[in-house]
Regions:
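Short, well-ordered alpha-helical segments enriched in acidic and aromatic residues
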Residues: 42-60, 67
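Hydrophobic h-region of N-terminal signal peptides that target proteins for export
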Residues: 9-18
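Surface-exposed, charged secondary-structure patches
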Residues: 23, 28, 57, 61, ...
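Hydrophobic alpha-helical core bundles mediating ligand binding, dimerization, or RNAP-core interactions
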Residues: 33-36, 40, 52, 76, ...
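Short beta-strand edge/turn micro-motifs at domain boundaries
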Residues: 22, 127-160
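Positively charged n-region of N-terminal signal peptides that target proteins for export
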Residues: 1-4, 191
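Short, low-complexity N-terminal intrinsically disordered segments enriched in polar/charged residues
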Residues: 17-50, 163-170, 178-192
Length: 192
């Protein structure tokens, strides 16, 4: 019985020891998620590019693909600050669906959803629920993003709904104009 107690104690000690490193890894990854969310919300592109690998691939929600920090910087400039930019302000909130899937001690895959609010330069505003996935790598003692893919539902989103409402309004207006034109031409033909 004493032997069984010793064996069980060893298993418990080994299990506790094995779980401790993963918890510190997941805490570091949570901190990276918070850092990147805050950087996006504050328009801090310097922090964003400081936390990606030199060969990062970023697929944006609007189907652009950026490779490397310089292209990420150029993308944010094009979308948020350059003449003719589209987005005035972006607010995001990322949620992971599960703990990062770890491969060895230096690679992980994370995925989840985001609730995003866009203020556009044309005065438009909309909220959209996004989906994301990313590959993370540890270089030295730092976790960095090596790949980030961001998407939204193409069949159900606020931009599609806005377009649908515009088309319905245009169809109703065209119908009313057609009826009025027909009535006017009909009256004119009767007088002639």
């Amino acid at each position: 019985m004493k032997r069984l107690g010793i064996v069980l104690s060893l298993f418990i000690a080994l299990a506790a020891h094995a779980q401790a490193p993963d918890e510190s890894v997941h805490q570091a990854l949570r901190q990276l998620k918070t850092t990147m969310s805050n950087a996006l919300n504050n328009g801090d592109v310097d922090t964003i590019v400081a936390n990606v690998t030199p060969n990062v691939v970023f697929t944006t929600m609007n189907d652009d693909v950026c490779r490397g920090p310089a292209q990420i910087r150029a993308y944010f400039q094009k979308m948020m600050t350059a003449p003719g930019h589209v987005v005035k302000k972006l607010t995001v909130s990322f949620d992971a669906d599960a703990l990062t899937i770890l491969y060895g001690g230096d690679t992980g895959i994370a995925y989840g959803s985001s609730n995003d609010h866009y203020d556009l330069t044309d005065g438009g505003k909309f909220d959209i629920r996004g989906r994301w996935s990313c590959t993370l790598v540890r270089e030295g003692n730092r976790w960095l993003i090596a790949n980030f893919h961001y998407s939204a539902n193409v069949f159900n989103n606020p931009i599609l709904e806005r377009t649908r409402m515009y088309l319905i309004g245009a169809a109703i207006a065209a119908g009313i104009i057609g009826l009025l034109l027909g009535w006017f031409l009909g009256r004119r033909a009767r007088k002639a």
